[in-house]
């Protein structure tokens, strides 16, 4: 069951990590200018989580109605989350909303390749925060993975200069760069914070509960961005922006908006799902290894240059990915193969022929 969840979360995280930045950049390069609106879309797809939550609720209710179930008289809860976990999820959600704005601001003015490069630096900080917050244990394989991925991202930086879009001013480029750096640092803190929340929760953390946590986090993040949209007046100009969109007009615009919200939801759900199934470091490693893949898609979709350094970075990232998960496989195998202590047998007592 756990292996299946890991595979599912890896797939949806892959789709979200690669697709989210590309769709967001597509919006900004074709007439879209609403940064708060894009921040809103990053988590606005949370209602789709209600589908698996409904399935989980119906399954629990069916189980409680089973006459063989000792707890069949207890009323089935619609939500499993208790108040302390609810409050913690809101706080993390507000931080996520802020992170969404910072990242969307960066994507508005930076090429996908550059923003991916900057976001990739979160791995080193993710490892640091994981060590400080949840006492993450490092193995030679995980250390090797962090070093390889960090070096790969550093190689990408060799040709990051000179990629400023022609339509952007120097000030916009620099501010976008700094915003993306802060976004990387903040999300590197958020992932271990989610793992710490799991560990400190006073209730059993199950995958349905993880879905509830994700929904509350996204609801809080979306509310944060809605306030920003009201302040800057985004709601008043969306219809006009749709009509003036350069590709496909209003129909394509609204289709892009819906798909972007769904894809980004996959990113966040996959990220915290891997934190649940493995660790925050594992989630950070997978996100980092997918960044060069996003670079390749950016080259194809936006005709960004693909220098030799990007190819080397891609190979190093794949090497780091294999190194990390090979180490996890070996650690798991050692636990399985560890000899169990023999059962203690009671001594055989002599049977006396004497009958009282």
Curated annotation (Swiss-Prot):
Compartment annotation: Cell membrane
GO MF annotation terms: purine nucleobase transmembrane transporter activity; purine nucleoside transmembrane transporter activity
Signal peptide stretch: none
Single GO BP term: cytokinin transport
Listed transmembrane segments: 4-24, 35-55, 78-98, 114-134, 138-158, 174-194, 213-233, 256-276, 282-302, 311-331
Family per similarity comment: Belongs to the purine permeases (TC 2.A.7.14) family.
Activity regulation details: Inhibited by diethylstilbestrol, N,N'-dicyclohexylcarbodiimide, carbonyl cyanide m-chlorphenyl-hydrazone and 2,4-dinitrophenol. Competitive inhibition of adenine transport by isopentenyladenine, cytosine, cytidine, hypoxanthine, kinetin, zeatin, nicotine and caffeine, but not by zeatin riboside or kinetin riboside.
Known function: Proton-coupled purine transporter mediating adenine and trans-zeatin uptake. High affinity transporter for pyridoxine involved in the uptake of vitamin B6. Also able to transport caffeine and adenosine. May be involved in the uptake of cytokinin, caffeine and nicotine from the xylem sap into shoot tissues.
EamA domain: residues covered: 35-158
Name the record gives this protein: Purine permease 1
UniProt entry keywords in alphabetical sequence: Cell membrane, Membrane, Transmembrane, Transmembrane helix, Transport
GO cellular component, one term: plasma membrane
Pfam family, any one: PUNUT
Chief location of this protein within or outside the cell: membrane
Record carries keyword Transmembrane: yes
Reported tissue expression: Highly expressed in leaves, stems and flowers, lower in siliques and not detected in roots. Expressed in the epithem of hydathodes and the stigma surface of siliques.
Topology versus the membrane: Multi-pass membrane protein
